[in-house]
Amino acid sequence: GDILDLGPDYRARQDANDRALLDELQTRLADEDHPKVRQDLEILIQSITDEIETRRINREFMLPYYNIHQLIFGSFNALLDPRNDNSRYAKALDRLRKYNGSEPGFTPITELAMARSSERFDDGLLGPYQGEVDKDLSDASRYIAGTRTFFERAGLEGWEDEFAKLEAQLDEYAAWVEAEMLPRARTGNQLPAEVYANNLKNFGVRATPDELIREAQYVYQFIRSEMKALALRIADERSWEDSDLVSVIRRLKAEQIPQGDLIDIYKERLADIEEIIRREDIITLPERDASIRPATEAESAAVPAPFMSPPQLINNTGQYGEFVLVQSNPALGEDAIMDDWSHDAITWALTVHEARPG
């Protein structure tokens, strides 16, 4: 039932907790002889050190901003996941009361988020990207509706009044974001160099932005050349007059699969791929079937591209990942339906990537 700490001086508490954990890990490292255990400890130490540095950099440059609607959606999505043991579901009521401040000793998380942002309004920091804030406001109602669906599906009792209280707080928070954060948002998406480089590092990229740009320019041209050669082959095999890369991609994307048939087609592709894997003895496959399902509207708002939804990793009792097929980006309004993942050519590569063996 624990929730995100956004109380006063929360960053100092986070740093203190992490430094205490660092001391413990470094003590264990000094007493450890096994090379693989030492390696694990060194990885943990580096990860925590990076987290402390990330908080320092963000505090120096960036105005705090929180997408509370998405945070709460993700929190209950993980807890009330149908793949979980339903004995955990009752904890959602405790978590709900903590989020909305009904639980003694807790302040509504929306109030804390507003306080943490507004206390730094005068520090000359860089605001969030305007496009990000606009999208968050557009998706707010979808996250609320999606979170409500989790509670309805879980079959819990006595959540409705507490949820209504939280929903009212979220509506108030959205109005505050529009009135206070949106005017402070930056119009360009470029980040300070220090923040950008640190973000890269947190994704495992230790190269500097300049090094990465140079490498990307070279690799882009290399991959594009390979794609052009492949486009020529495809056009020749299909007797298409236009054989340039863009024309071939457009022709391939025009081969759209009806929405009602899409999941079945992906399951057919999966069966074909698994047969190839068995025939060629590439890897050992699980005995259970892989799961492929369409995304909900709220999931599409959170991740507007197909993704693998991982199971719980701690105390896993047999839960497994799901290939979630996203077919729309709700933030785009009339252009919400995408054609990137529903044409025949993409079904093979995407199934390999998100299902098996990916």
Each PLM stretch: what is its role?
Residues 1-358:
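N-terminal maturation segment of proteins
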